[in-house]
Amino acid sequence: MARIATESRTTGETKIQVTLNLDGSGKAQVDTGVGFLDHMLDQIARHGGMDLEIEACGDQHIDDHHTVEDVGITMGQAFRQAIGDRRGITRFGHAYVPLDEALSRVVVDLSNRPSLSWRVKFPTQKVGNFDTELFKEWFAAFAQQGGITMHVESLYGENSHHIAESCFKALARALRSACAVDATLGGVAPSTKGTLSD
């Protein structure tokens, strides 16, 4: 069964469409109008083994906040739809990913009990023109809408770009592990209560 979903979101602030294939080959076609976010989402696709298409436009004459958050919301909704009832998946995943001097760790549980634990500090307020406080907004929106318990931690690092990118790459690798089908489960939900869809 194909694990593919398309979700759209239109508000007075943004218009977004996301197509996500969890069993892809790492191809990304992303245009959010926010260059650094595009770069990070390309990492999700590449290192998560997903195919990702995103087309977004927003009120960037104000700032990038609405676009970044709403892309996280819509991508999370597409993830939730694509993963389905979560039967037979590994469920848990974690990854440590370095980028030069920076090292980050992400741990996920596809429990359908969304939450974000965020322990990431950036030494600068911006990466280029991108506000570093918006990284948490994207992760929070994606976790909430995707039904993911997510722990994101920067263990150390000096360069804000490297810290952010190592977090996104670690998320990609953790999701790749958690989404993998575990043949030993025989299609059963990996939970003692028998379901992860409620």
Curated annotation (Swiss-Prot):
PROSITE patterns referenced in this protein's UniProt entry, alphabetically: IGP_DEHYDRATASE_1, IGP_DEHYDRATASE_2
Localization terms from the record: Cytoplasm
Predominant localisation class: cytoplasm
InterPro entries for this protein: IGPD_sf (IPR038494), ImidazoleglycerolP_deHydtase (IPR000807), ImidazoleglycerP_deHydtase_CS (IPR020565), Ribosomal_Su5_D2-typ_SF (IPR020568)
Pfam families xrefs: IGPD
Single GO MF annotation: imidazoleglycerol-phosphate dehydratase activity
Keywords in alphabetical order: Amino-acid biosynthesis, Cytoplasm, Histidine biosynthesis, Lyase
PANTHER family on file: IMIDAZOLEGLYCEROL-PHOSPHATE DEHYDRATASE (PTHR23133:SF2), IMIDAZOLEGLYCEROL-PHOSPHATE DEHYDRATASE HIS7 (PTHR23133)
Name of the protein in its database record: Imidazoleglycerol-phosphate dehydratase
Gene name in the database record: hisB
